[in-house]
């Protein structure tokens, strides 16, 4: 191993140990949340997915010329460390976790530059989606989703002629062969946050692994060339569509539970059906995402379809022209 390579290796090892030491508590608590909070249980797979992406792209990443930006990268690292200190002082876990992303991004910019950071946007995005959001933000999102799901359930049951009444996120109905009114509460776990976060992550992974190698970055060296890239917009549409798909499929699940509760009793909302319907909704949502990907590919521009083959075509070398004899004005060969 050459001396420069050995220095880079030891520098990477030292930096890794420094991050582990500084963020040991943050990483332990993050792992605990992934293991115990079902809304973010997909986070357990994120390190392996990120590792696979980086490993599969290792040759391409190694070919990126190092263009370090010491000033911007150093400023980002300092801001990350300050955010870590502020998060610890204020006992705010989300700030501490975001500081880790800022520190990692700053390190990449400091040593390699923005070119490498652009290639790592997907791993950074996956890590961001795995961070549990603050409780105050979670509640602001979850409760409106609970109300939306309960409204959809009441509307669906009304369309089927089922007598039902809604009070907030509580659905009152009278099951068949029962003289008592039963209540179904659309609790926080049924808000759809879990399926929303999981499906967003799945959409990013699906869009990344089904894109063409020809659509990896800006075209013709232009800064905003990616805005004219079909594969960029395909990935954007797939990821954005994950939000309404997750919300609507969860509302469909709650509606189905309400209908079955009318015919078979409210106990249907617990036990096997509750778990089975959750997995069924995930499968349905992914099928819809997959269908959107297929639909977009049907409208794929010709230039996007043939971009890879065109890029592999080598232009006719200019030297071939110079091999022909040049005739002067007098007709003699030069």
Show where each model-derived region lies.
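Hydrophobic N-terminal alpha-helices or hydrophobic patches in metabolic proteins across all domains
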Residues: 1-334
């Amino acid at each position: 191993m050459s001396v420069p390579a050995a220095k880079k290796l030891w520098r990477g090892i030292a930096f890794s140990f420094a991050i582990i030491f500084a963020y040991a508590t943050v990483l332990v608590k993050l792992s605990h949340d992934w293991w115990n909070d079902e809304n973010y249980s997909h986070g357990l797979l994120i390190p392996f997915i990120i590792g696979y992406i980086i490993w599969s792209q290792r040759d391409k990443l190694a070919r990126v010329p190092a263009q370090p930006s010491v000033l911007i990268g150093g400023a980002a690292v300092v801001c990350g460390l300050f955010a870590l200190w502020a998060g610890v002082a204020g006992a705010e876990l989300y700030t501490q976790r975001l500081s880790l992303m800022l520190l990692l991004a700053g390190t990449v910019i400091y040593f390699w530059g923005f070119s490498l950071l652009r290639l790592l946007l997907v791993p950074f995005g996956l890590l961001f989606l795995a961070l549990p959001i603050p409780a105050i933000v979670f509640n602001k999102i979850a409760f409106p989703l609970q109300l939306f799901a309960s409204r959809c359930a009441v509307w669906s049951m009304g369309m089927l002629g089922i007598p039902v009444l809604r009070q907030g996120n509580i659905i009152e109905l009278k099951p068949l062969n029962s003289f008592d009114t039963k209540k179904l509460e659309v609790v926080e776990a049924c808000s759809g946050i879990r399926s929303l976060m999981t499906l967003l992550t799945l959409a990013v992974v699906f869009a990344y692994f089904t894109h063409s190698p020809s659509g990896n970055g800006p075209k013709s060296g232009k800064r905003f060339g990616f805005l004219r890239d079909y594969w960029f917009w395909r990935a954007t549409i797939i990821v954005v569509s994950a939000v309404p798909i997750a919300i609507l499929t969860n509302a469909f699940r709650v509606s189905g539970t309400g209908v079955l509760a009318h015919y078979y009793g409210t106990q249907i909302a617990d036990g096997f059906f509750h778990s089975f319907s959750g997995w069924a909704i995930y499968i349905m949502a992914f099928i819809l995402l997959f269908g959107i990907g297929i639909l977009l590919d049907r409208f794929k521009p010709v230039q996007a379809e043939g971009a890879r083959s065109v890029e592999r075509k080598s232009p006719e070398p200019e030297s071939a022209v110079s091999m022909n004899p040049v005739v002067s004005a007098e007709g003699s060969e030069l």
